[in-house]
Amino acid sequence: MKMDSSSIRELRDRTGLGLSDCKKALEECDGDIKKAVDRLRTIGFAKADKKSDRVASDGLIAMCLAKNYGVLVKVNCETDFVARNEKFIALVSNLASIACQERCTSLDELKNAKYEDVGTVQEAIISGTSVLGEKLELSNLCYLETKDGIIAGYVHGDMHGLGKIGALVALQSSGDKQEIGKQIAMHVVAMKPEALSIDDLDQEKLNNERSIIEEQVKSLNKPEEVAKKIVDGRMAKYYEEVVLLEQKFIKDDKMKIADFIESSAVKLANYKLLTLDGANK
C-alpha cells in the first residue's frame, strides 16, 4: 500500500522520527496514523531499552515560576551535542512548564503527567531517546512554595534560559521582591551553600568538623582560653563557607547575606539548589 506524503509528514510531526521509520510504520498499519503512532512508540521503547545501561552525564536544568511556587527540572543526556539540540531544549522547557502547571512535587508525579499527544512525560522521554539517539533521563525535580510571599529563581546558562545549575528562593515579603530574590538565587548558584542557617546544618557533620578543628588546635599547645577562641574563629570561617545566611554576599563582600536580606525588608524562608553533577539541596 503506497502512503501519501501528507500522512507521512503528519506522523513525523507527531513522533519526531525519521522518514523511513514513519513510512514503514504506516505501511505496516495500512495507513492508520493512530496505529502507526502506537507502533512507533513500541519501537521507541525498544530503542530506549537498548540505551538504558549508558551513562547520561550531560544535560540541562530548566526553571518555571508561578507567583508563590516554582520548579526546577533536570533532564540528563549523554553529550553536550544533544544538550544543545533544539529538540532537547524544547523537551526540557516543556517538562518544566508541565511540572509548574500541574504543581508536581515529585519525579513520579511529573513522569505520569500528560505530555501533548505523546502520552505521558515518561513516554516523551523514551520517544526523545529514540529520536535523538542518546539515553535521556528525567533525573531530578525541585519544588518550592511559600504561603506569604514570592518564589524567585535563577538558572545559570546560555541556552534559551536553561543551564547547568539553578536555584529557587522563597521570600516572605509584602511587595514584589523578584529582583531581590533573583540576586539571592544568583548568590546560591555561585556559592552553593549546604544549609540556610547554622541550625539547619547536619549535626553529625558539624560535630565532626568541630572535632577535626579541635585536634588541629590542640597541636598548637595554646592556653585553653586562647585555643577556644581559635576554634570558634575557625568554626565561624567554616560557617561562612557552607551556611547561606553566614556567607558574604557576592555583590558586596562587606555584608553577609543575612545583612542584605535585613536591609531589603524581606525574610528568606527557604531555598533549593540543583546542579547537573547531582549536588542539590
UniProtKB/Swiss-Prot annotation:
Keyword Iron carried by entry: no
Positions of the UniProt region annotated as Involved in Mg(2+) ion dislocation from EF-Tu: 79-82
GO MF entry, a single one: translation elongation factor activity
Signal peptide: none
Family as reported in the entry's similarity comment: Belongs to the EF-Ts family.
PANTHER family: ELONGATION FACTOR TS, ELONGATION FACTOR TS, MITOCHONDRIAL
Protein's UniProt name: Elongation factor Ts
Species whose genome carries this gene: Wolbachia pipientis subsp. Culex pipiens (strain wPip)
